[in-house]
Amino acid sequence: KGPQEGEDFFVTCRVGGGDGYTTHVRASFAYVDAEKGGILNNTRPATDKDYSGAIARCPRPVVGHENCQFQIYPDYGQISKYTGVLYPYNLEIFRDRLKENHLSSQAKSFHQATGHFSIECYKADMEYAFRTPGFGGFQLLDLQDYPGQGSALVGILDAFMDSKGIVEPETFYGFCAPLVPLALMKDHCWLNTQRL
C-alpha cells in the first residue's frame, strides 16, 4: 500500500510505484521476491549506486526493512548449547545430511567461507544505504541467528548471542558506524593500467 496517512516515516524493503530494482531499499531478496534475488545478486559489483530513485518516490523518510539477510552455514559445535526447552532438530538434520554425503570433514570450512562471504554482503548492503542521501536508515533482521519456525541463520552471532568467529566487532564497526568512509567507483576490480 505504501506510506499511510499519519506516518512520520516509512519502513519497507520496496517503496513501490516502479519496475525492477528501482523501488528497492535493500540489496537482497529471496529469488521468489525479486529478479535473481535483488540488486546485489544480479548487478555488476560497484560502489556508485544507491537507493535515491526509490526514496524519491516517497514523501517521507524511508527506513530499509530487514536488510542484510545472508545465510551462514551452521557451526555444529553450537548444538551442545541447547540445554533448555528449545531443541536444535534443524541443525541435526543439516549435520546428518552432510554426513550422508560424506562432507562432514568440510563443515568448518563451509561455515568460515559462507561467514566471510556474508560479511562482505553485509558491508555491500549497508554501503548502499549509507551512500543514499536522505535515506532514513535501515534495520537488520537480527544480529543473531533465529532458530524458530524455519531457520534464519543470517546473524553474525549465533542464537545464544555468541560470536561465530567470523568478524571482530572492530571490523564490523568499520563499515557500520555513524561515520563510514566511502568511495564511489563503477567497478570493484581494477587493472594496473587503469586510472582511478
Question: Over which residues does each language-model region extend?
Answer:
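Aromatic-rich peripheral "rim/lid" segments of glycoside hydrolase catalytic domains that contact
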Residues: L140-L196
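Substrate-binding/catalytic cleft of secreted carbohydrate-active enzymes
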Residues: K1-L157
